[in-house]
């Protein structure tokens, strides 16, 4: 009940304060503080999904004393909405079908979501502390092309506050070049609630990065990675990756499903190799 009220209050208040000239920024800060106060006062849940969903609120962590333009606020809202939608999908345990399971226990599941399409869910355990994964996936985001063959380049186009960025990602060809060059422009939102880190995002429009010649502009749906220490083994990390992509173009569904499922398996393997070969930074999420 609190979560439903939480979302409704945040959404309607956000639209209202955007039209309040002169008082917009102060109203947003007050709203965020009040929502956080109410959320943190709620009952404790044993589920890490509910822990994040309950404490994550629209604009709730954007409390630094900074002025945001209307466009900045729109990006922040979009990132928060992507996170909430992705966590909603992950929190529903019904209807998931097994795509593959590796000898090391890595598992890919899939599910068809109305108005979203087929999504894929990677479940892995990485023999590294959560902070190490955060360093590579957030602090070193633009270096992902160095270790992930599925990515040619990632560039941060704009930073908004401490939680939100706009990125441009150029993906490599896949399936023996049957899937040609794609790129993505996305808004990404990063949060930590207790011992859980969530990295979420979805496609967005960014005027300074128009479509590129010879490259198909694909779109991320609501997607996220959830990181938290493995129960009983805090030096290990449980990683859950919800992947939702519209590759655009004329591609058979069988090829799309095969590419996306294998992309997740390969990602886990390449991430492990990267973490083993690189020193840690002094970073905390």
From Swiss-Prot:
Q: Which SUPFAM superfamilies match?
A: Bet v1-like (SSF55961)
GO biological process terms held by the UniProt record = cholesterol metabolic process; intracellular cholesterol transport; regulation of steroid biosynthetic process; steroid biosynthetic process
| Entry keyword set | Lipid transport, Lipid-binding, Mitochondrion, Phosphoprotein, Steroidogenesis, Transit peptide, Transport
START domain mapped to chain residues: 67-280
Task: State the tissue distribution.
Answer: Expressed in adult and fetal steroidogenic tissues, including adult testes and ovaries and adult adrenal glands as well as steroidogenic tissues of pregnancy, including developing fetal testes, corpus luteum, and pregnancy, but not in the fetal ovary.
Pathway terms, separated by semicolons:
Steroid metabolism; cholesterol metabolism
Q: Name one GO molecular function term.
A: cholesterol transfer activity
Listed under catalytic activity are: cholesterol(in) = cholesterol(out)
| PROSITE patterns per UniProt | START
The organism's place on the tree of life at top rank: Eukaryota
S-S bonds: none
Q: How does the record describe its quaternary structure? A: May interact with TSPO.
Tell me the function of this protein: Plays a key role in steroid hormone synthesis by enhancing the metabolism of cholesterol into pregnenolone. Mediates the transfer of cholesterol from the outer mitochondrial membrane to the inner mitochondrial membrane where it is cleaved to pregnenolone.
Q: What is this protein called?
A: Steroidogenic acute regulatory protein, mitochondrial
Give me the gene this protein comes from: STAR
